[in-house]
Amino acid sequence: MYIHEKQLIQAGKLAAHAKKAVVLLHGRGSSASGILSLSHHLQLDDALLLAPQATNNSWYPYSFLAPVANNQPALDSALGLVGEAEAKAAQLGVAPNALYFVGFSQGACLVLEYVGRNAKPYGGVIAFTGGLIGESLTLSNYTGDFGGTPILITSGDNDPHVPLYRIEESASVLRGLGAKVTLEIYPGKPHSISPDETLLANKVVLS
């Protein structure tokens, strides 16, 4: 088991010239620099980019469907890193309604878990193949009010890592917290991010 070293890559616009800030969370086996390359396919030219790096390139050791205790202390440490990225954006003068979150796979799960536990009117959330974390969901963990925050969740209909039932369950929980959730499921899509998904993210969340 492990906790995360504090590593945060800052890229994109300087805070003084940015219209928004975006926290990007990489998937298992990837890196902060890898997820930053996704910014070239999203409408983020006006954004300050903040990308935490997971120790061992993994936010938590087991499946996101494992009992939460099995993924500790790495999971709580990872959530803390996301919180520090949000605090960094605030320190640089970015209001919550100009703060966005983007994640893929394990990073998408972490994004949804973080915002679900800290719901407020954010700028928007993009989860490419992800769902809320845990063997079963502890609904009391998810508090606050998104105030209509747009949240996009995309996935394939038979993803090998993120089952559709958990994606749908997660969308329901987030809607209950006041988010405007768009759920897009692609038949036969592999475990990756497709051009259709980035186009939809630009339209639904970033436009």
Language model features: what each stretch is:
Residues K120-I133:
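A conserved short beta-strand
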Residues L152-S155, D159:
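Short beta-strand/loop motif that positions the catalytic acidic residue
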Residues Y2-N97:
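Serine-hydrolase catalytic machinery in alpha/beta-hydrolase-like enzymes
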Residues I35-L38, L139, P163-V173:
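Short alpha-helix in the alpha/beta-hydrolase fold that links the catalytic acid
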Residues V102-G107, V111:
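Gly/Ala-rich beta-loop-alpha elbow adjacent to hydrolase catalytic centers
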